[in-house]
């Protein structure tokens, strides 16, 4: 029986009935080196109390098999108590001891205990990833965040392996029957939730140092450890990672006025990781994509630093104080997202951190918040499947954006003081929104419920704007602030905004700031609001060539530049602005205009072409390079795209030629050139040159000119681009795959083979995706990403089979793997297929088939329906923009 989807009501009933004291967990990884073994033994003893003796509950365990279950000394009959992913526990006593012996699966999906065999040297690596509910794939437990406990881990594994967990290692004892095996015993953990327990095992490279605090608030020296695969050791810049970690610990301990609450700080960079990182206390895990084998730009380093600080903030927000249920996931993720950027800027001096936040994180939030499945920051999470889908742009980026608005609303010092009180009051416990609001009310001296109602418990994004009213003499008489509230906003409820307006003059092609002043939108739901201005402000606003609303990016709202605001001045002078954040806000506004079919893609691409060689910020340059390609692929008219891609290729190539050797710009632009070559008519020789350098130990003209070494990452990107255009043979791909076996090679090969634009390869890729459940998460993703390249006509025959297979995929795969397939294979028919003259967006095959499936499957799992609804909405937006751009093309 598939009963894995624990409901909120079931969790509440269980936490009202029991409290958990300790888990004693033994995991035996003796057989992990042998790929023939698909499972490993576990033994778990749980001590818990029940406030209603005689009652019953259940414990969670997604298992390979169960050997025995003993409750309070009584052996239970397996066929009577084991029911799918649950084990029924009846006739409970006031104090209970439960012991379960079983076997758990090694994972290939990144959920549970993931096992990886390194193709470059055969070494074995294991790590766990649980959030929100995959700890039960490793050992039996009460899988919900408010049943915290102390964990005692014992891990049996090869003696020469690295083995770690949340707590410090107490002892290591050699197996008397096999001196190549030993058992590691770890100290008891603090009282933590199941989803942040962790195990690491394998032949990892280990770097160590000791953190000696400079902060006033601290708990003394802390051992620091960093892990990675042995084959990545030459690229592992652990000194930088340690420096960021030390800076972060100094910063956050003083900021929160609370010492780091755990005895060690370890960070493992692991393969085939599904997410960016996970805040397991004492043993944080990261994707090994943060080990930069092809060199690192400032933007790359900033991104990793942000993630390190994000996870570190979780040691307080999330680990020390944890949400009661996943409804309040924002209580940790929104705060950590905000603190990650703050830590990158203030503790580690990445000056563009808030620029990246504005252009990347908030763009994610705006996109997510306009979907039909958007939800309040404080979400309604009825069950675990819903929880798994809510690690999204609302919970993370919108939540962090709203916290930034909160800081502007109550002041930074008040916000931080509230956090300090919150940690001390609720340490080692669980909380909800009301607990946080109570503290915020006390510290701020204000009733914050209205603010919470407006920002945390509503969904959708407001659209802000300005209108200038002039008198007959040509002088400004009024400045009107406009606000379009989301359609789903409750009647009578507005949104208070604290923002800034900056005025600019365009002089000799340069935008010069002439003034900036604060504005407050009223809390009432008004669509227009007249601003009281001084005479000087009236003059500045009236004469401005550009009005930048939400200057400094304090509030959360779409600000679409219009001709009245100075759209043309913004496009003409964006590169002349001194402030990277101001430039970023203009690029962000232009991007939203493209998505909303208000700005032609040709205009956006032309702006990128004219400014790409002038942008000094690595963060903004990367966004420009990436978004310009997405704009063409997703929103432009299907005819004429090659011309736009070629224009980008020429612009990137010219900018690369004048970029400083060894600069960030060089690497960003070279990556962009390879990517554009996937769709342009140009770039074949560049990609062949890179492939030769990567796989034949030669260098070519481009390598000689830039000094950038051609490694496997760049090589497989180049081969993937060539494969998409049918400019490389299967034999060439096979030869490259054997040059230097590695994860990069195997995934690059899977992508390139699936990208080849012929019916045979698309059929093989589709079958592999749907039928081969042995694929790892990364291999599946690479195959999907290659499959969707090339002419849409090669995939049309799979539109119907895709929808027919959805329920089966959801039932047979883990939620992570199923989600990859559902999102990745969703059909993306362009507007001119099925949407010719006289036909609407809903007549497009992709949209129509999705609608038919949704109507035919009203009882399908809500998480699956959400994925289909979101994909359908992305399709609708894409088709509307394509039609808009095609209509301009026809004029």
Task: Describe the residue ranges of each PLM region.
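Charged, low-complexity, helix-prone segments enriched in Lys/Glu/Asp/Gln
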Residues: 14-27, 150-151, 238, 343-347, ...
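Short glycine-rich loop/turn motifs
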Residues: 85, 281-282, 374, 715-719
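Small/polar loops that bind or transfer phosphate-bearing groups
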Residues: 61, 308, 753
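Acidic/His-enriched low-complexity segments
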Residues: 1-263, 289, 366-367, 391-397, ...
């Amino acid at each position: 029986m598939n009963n894995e989807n624990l409901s909120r009501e079931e969790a509440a009933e269980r936490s009202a009935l029991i409290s958990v004291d300790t888990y004693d967990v033994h995991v035996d990884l003796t057989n992990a080196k042998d790929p023939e073994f698909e499972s490993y033994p576990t033994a778990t003893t749980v001590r818990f109390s029940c406030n209603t003796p005689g009652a019953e509950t259940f414990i969670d365990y997604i298992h390979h098999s169960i050997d025995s279950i003993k409750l309070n000394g009584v052996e239970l009959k397996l066929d009577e108590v084991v029911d799918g992913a649950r084990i029924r526990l009846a006739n409970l006593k006031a104090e209970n001891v439960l012991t379960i012996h079983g076997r758990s699966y090694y994972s290939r999906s990144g959920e549970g205990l993931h096992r990886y065999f390194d193709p470059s040297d055969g070494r074995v690596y294991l790590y766990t990833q649980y959030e929100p509910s995959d700890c039960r794939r490793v050992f039996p437990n009460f899988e919900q965040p408010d049943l915290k406990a102390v964990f005692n881990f014992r891990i049996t594994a090869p003696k020469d392996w690295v083995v770690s967990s949340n707590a410090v290692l107490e002892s290591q004892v050699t197996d008397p029957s096999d001196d190549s095996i030993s058992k590691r015993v770890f100290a008891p953990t603090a009282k933590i939730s199941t989803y942040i327990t962790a195990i690491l095992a394998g032949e990892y490279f280990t770097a160590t140092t000791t953190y000696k605090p400079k902060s006033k608030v601290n708990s003394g020296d802390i051992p620091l450890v960093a892990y990675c695969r042995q084959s990545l050791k030459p690229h592992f810049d652990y000194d930088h990672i340690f420096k960021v970690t030390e800076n972060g610990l100094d910063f956050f301990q003083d900021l929160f006025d609370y010492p780091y609450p755990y005895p060690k700080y370890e960070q493992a960079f692991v393969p085939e990781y599904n997410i960016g990182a996970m805040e397991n206390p004492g043993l944080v895990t990261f994707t090994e994509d943060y080990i930069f084998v092809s060199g690192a730009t400032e933007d790359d380093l900033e991104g990793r630093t942000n993630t390190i600080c994000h996870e570190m903030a979780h040691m307080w927000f999330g680990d020390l104080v944890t949400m009661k249920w996943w409804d309040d996931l924002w209580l940790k993720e929104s705060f950590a997202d905000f603190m990650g950027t703050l830590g990158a800027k203030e503790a580690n001096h990445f000056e563009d951190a808030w620029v990246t936040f504005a252009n990347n994180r908030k763009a994610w939030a705006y996109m997510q918040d306009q979907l039909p499945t958007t939800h309040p920051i404080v979400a309604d999470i009825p069950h675990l499947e819903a929880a798994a889908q809510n690690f999204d742009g609302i919970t993370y980026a919108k939540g962090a954006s709203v916290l930034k608005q909160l800081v502007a609303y109550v002041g930074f010092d008040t916000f931080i003081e509230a956090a300090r009180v919150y940690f001390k009051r609720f340490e080692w416990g669980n909380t909800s929104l009301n607990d946080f609001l109570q503290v915020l009310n006390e510290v701020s001296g204000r009733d914050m419920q209205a603010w919470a109602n407006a920002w945390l418990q509503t969904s959708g994004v407001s659209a802000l704007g300005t209108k200038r009213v002039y008198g007959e003499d040509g002088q400004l008489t009024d400045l009107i602030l406009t606000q379009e509230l989301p359609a789903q906003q409750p009647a009578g409820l507005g949104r208070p905004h604290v923002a800034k307006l900056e005025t600019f003059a365009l002089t000799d092609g340069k935008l010069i700031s002439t003034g900036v002043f604060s504005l407050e939108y009223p809390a009432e739901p008004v669509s227009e609001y007249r601003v009281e201005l001084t005479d000087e402000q009236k003059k500045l606003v009236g004469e401005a060539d550009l009005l930048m609303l939400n200057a400094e990016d304090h509030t959360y709202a779409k600000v679409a530049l219009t001709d009245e605001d100075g759209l043309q001045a913004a496009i003409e002078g964006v590169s002349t602005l001194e402030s990277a954040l101001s430039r970023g806000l203009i690029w962000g506004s232009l991007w939203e205009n493209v998505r909303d079919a208000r700005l032609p893609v040709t205009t956006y691409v032309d702006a990128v072409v004219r400014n790409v060689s002038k942008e000094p910020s690595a963060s903004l340059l990367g966004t420009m390079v990436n978004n310009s390609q997405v704009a063409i692929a997703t929103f432009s008219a299907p005819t004429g795209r090659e011309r736009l891609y070629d224009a980008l290729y020429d612009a990137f190539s010219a900018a690369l030629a004048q970029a400083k050797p060894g600069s960030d710009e060089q690497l960003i632009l070279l990556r962009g050139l390879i990517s554009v070559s996937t769709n342009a008519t140009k770039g074949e020789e560049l990609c062949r040159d890179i492939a030769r350098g990567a796989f034949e130990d030669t260098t070519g003209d481009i390598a000689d000119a830039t000094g950038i070494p051609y490694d496997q990452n760049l090589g497989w990107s180049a081969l993937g681009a060539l494969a998409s255009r049918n400019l490389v043979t299967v034999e060439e791909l096979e030869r490259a795959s054997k040059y230097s076996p590695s994860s990069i090679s195997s995934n690059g090969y899977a992508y390139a083979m699936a990208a080849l634009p012929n019916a045979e390869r698309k059929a093989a890729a589709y079958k592999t995706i749907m039928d081969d459940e042995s694929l790892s998460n990364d291999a599946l993703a690479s195959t999907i990403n290659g499959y969707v390249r090339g002419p849409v006509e090669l995939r049309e025959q799979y539109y119907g089979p895709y929808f027919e297979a959805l329920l089966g995929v959801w039932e047979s795969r883990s939620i992570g793997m199923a989600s990859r397939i559902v999102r990745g294979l969703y059909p993306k028919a362009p507007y001119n297929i099925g949407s010719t003259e006289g036909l609407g967006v809903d007549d497009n095959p992709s949209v129509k088939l999705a609608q038919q499936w949704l109507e035919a499957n009203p009882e399908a799992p809500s998480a699956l329906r959400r994925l289909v609804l979101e994909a359908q909405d992305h399709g609708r937006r894409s088709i509307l923009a394509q039609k808009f751009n095609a209509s301009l093309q026809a004029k």
